[in-house]
């Protein structure tokens, strides 16, 4: 445009436009750099140095040079540089950078300490368990930085649009400069000027710069709230989720089993039933066994236990001193021809028999997480059409949890492969164009996470398996983080659409004005650089979400 202005003899305008354009480009570059720095700072959880004890001395070195098994010292106000286990010291850790939670977490000797957490109160001596590159902070930042390589459909559309749009407007600008003088016989100077004005206005920078920046900012804003999104394609997919399928245990419920009732029979007391159950389960590592032993709460003399047999799918039989104890489900009672009373309450039931006589039943339940019910309500409020729960537990447990949380559907007594089948069935029924998300623990649900449009793993903090398995990782065990993720996704898409409308709308008006000779080169530069700055500043709003 500047060359064109020189050609047609508009020397002052040529110089002025060049200066104005450079000023505009400077502010545009400044806005883009600042926005990217804001996002990078948001995710800057990697410490620059580590204090290591070597040969009886404390030295400060780069975290990359610390080996696994070395002792590091972290003072109050310092970030933990590598993952490890606390050898000595008590402190409160600010985990906000990893989880988005403002409530500090207390750590003591033997507790896990994750890199990226800010030490607040006491001096900690930590034995490293992972190298710097494999530590939590490094993995999180690598995931977020690599997320830009997975582009959203809207980003791909803008890239494709710009590929065709640019040559088209160049041709139109050439036609505008050449055809009217030839056809209408008018002077060349005015139409060449209009052609260059048209060309400057039509530059697609506002879209090409602001749209990817908005998605990058959305991923940064999500990470600030303890949600890792592995790509802008998944962020946009979250915006279109209409069906969310939850695994039950560890997702909607705590996954911690507790004895909630003991129903004795045939003259046995509650204490006797619990003691017999504890004797039977004393060698088992199953969560049900642990809950019974925790409820018993006494030291178990395992020397009196003999002839221990674990009967797969049925239960356990043992000799406890002179007593023959059976502990298991109704199938075990039926197999041993023991008459028993069926417990109708919802929960996991352990039936007990001693020396062939039915002794009673122990009821064990998994507690629903405090924020699960509100999460389901909030999801429906922000536009999720259907919430579904899948569980391997029996029908009564599934129904009880589903009714308590007011879920739309539930499916119980499912094996892992059956969960995949149910997700495929639900996927086929969802609204056309919408997405299905599955939320699980990221460890036992890998096949279902892979099958869903968006796989969401919960409790990713310190869990490599969860981070690897899913498209979106909720760093804590709170279901409410899912609402945060979708809200950020919707806000991101809203800003993207605003920028598209702003850029195309303003440019369309200025293109018409330029073609008619109403808009000059000053307006043209604003129509390009000015609109880009407006779009970039609008994109920055996502960091406030």
Q: Where are the language model's segments positioned?
A:
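Residue-level signature of catalytic and energy-coupling elements of molecular machines
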Residues: 10, 31, 50, 69, ...
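Juxtamembrane helix-loop transition segments at the membrane interface in multi-pass membrane proteins
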Residues: 27-41, 213-232, 540-545
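Cytosolic catalytic headpiece
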Residues: 41-42, 55, 232-454, 487-490
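Actuator/coupling domain of P-type ATPases
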Residues: 1-49, 53, 65-72, 79, ...
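A short beta-strand structural signal in non-transmembrane regions
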Residues: 124-130, 350, 388, 471
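Bilayer-spanning, highly hydrophobic alpha-helical transmembrane segments
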Residues: 156-185, 194-215, 497-526
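Conserved cytosolic headpiece of P-type ATPases
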Residues: 50, 61, 70, 82-83, ...
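Membrane-embedded alpha-helical bundles of multi-pass transporters
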Residues: 4, 8, 221, 383-384, ...
């Amino acid at each position: 445009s500047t060359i064109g202005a020189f050609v047609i003899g508009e020397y002052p305008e040529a110089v002025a436009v060049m200066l104005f354009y450079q000023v505009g480009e400077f502010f545009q570059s400044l806005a883009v750099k600042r926005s990217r720095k804001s996002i990078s700072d948001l995710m800057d959880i990697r410490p620059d140095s580590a204090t290591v004890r070597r040969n009886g001395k404390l030295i400060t070195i780069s975290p990359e040079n610390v080996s696994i098994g070395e002792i590091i010292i972290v003072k109050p106000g310092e970030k933990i540089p590598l993952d490890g286990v606390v050898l000595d010291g008590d402190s409160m850790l600010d985990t906000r950078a990893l989880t988005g939670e403002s409530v500090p977490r207390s750590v003591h000797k033997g507790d896990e300490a994750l890199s990226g957490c800010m030490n607040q109160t006491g001096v900690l001596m930590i034995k490293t368990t992972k190298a710097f590159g494999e530590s939590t902070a490094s993995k999180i930042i690598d995931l977020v930085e690599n997320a830009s390589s997975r582009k959203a459909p809207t980003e791909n559309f803008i890239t494709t649009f710009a590929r065709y749009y640019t040559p088209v407007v160049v041709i139109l600008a050439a036609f505008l400069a050449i055809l009217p003088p030839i056809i209408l016989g008018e002077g060349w100077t005015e139409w060449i000027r209009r052609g260059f004005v048209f060309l400057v206005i039509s530059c697609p920078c506002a879209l090409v710069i602001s749209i990817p920046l908005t998605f990058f900012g959305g991923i940064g804003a999500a990470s600030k709230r303890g949600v890792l999104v592995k790509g802008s394609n998944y962020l946009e997919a979250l915006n279109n989720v209409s069906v969310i399928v939850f695994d039950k245990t560890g997702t909607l419920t705590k996954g911690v089993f507790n004895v909630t009732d003991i129903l004795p029979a045939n003259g046995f007391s509650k204490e006797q039933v619990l003691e017999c159950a504890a004797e039977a389960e004393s060698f088992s590592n199953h969560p049900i066994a642990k809950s019974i032993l925790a409820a018993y709460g006494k030291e178990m003399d395992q020397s009196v236990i003999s002839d221990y047999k674990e009967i797969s799918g049925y239960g356990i039989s043992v000799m406890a001193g002179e007593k023959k104890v059976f502990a298991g489900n109704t199938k075990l009672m039926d197999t041993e021809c023991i008459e028993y009373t069926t417990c109708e309450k919802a929960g996991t039931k352990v039936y007990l028999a001693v020396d062939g006589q039915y002794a009673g039943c122990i009821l064990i339940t998994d507690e629903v997480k405090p924020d699960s019910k509100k999460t389901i309500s909030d999801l429906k409020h922000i536009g999720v059409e259907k919430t579904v729960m899948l569980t391997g537990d029996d029908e009564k447990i599934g129904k009880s949890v589903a009714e308590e949380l007011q879920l739309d559907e539930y499916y119980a007594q499912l094996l892992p492969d059956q969960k995949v089948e149910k997700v495929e069935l639900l996927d086929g029924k969802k609204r056309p164009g919408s997405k299905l998300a599955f939320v699980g623990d990221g460890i036992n649900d890998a096949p279902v996470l892979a099958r869903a449009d968006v796989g969401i793993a919960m409790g990713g903090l310190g869990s490599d398996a969860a981070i690897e398995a899913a498209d979106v990782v909720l760093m804590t065990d709170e279901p409410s983080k899912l609402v945060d993720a979708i809200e950020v996704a919707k806000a991101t898409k809203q800003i993207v659409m605003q920028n598209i409308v702003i850029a195309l709308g303003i440019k369309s008006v200025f293109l018409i004005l330029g073609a008619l000779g109403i808009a000059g080169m000053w307006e043209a530069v604003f129509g390009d650089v000015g609109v880009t700055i407006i779009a970039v500043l609008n994109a920055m709003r996502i960091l406030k979400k």
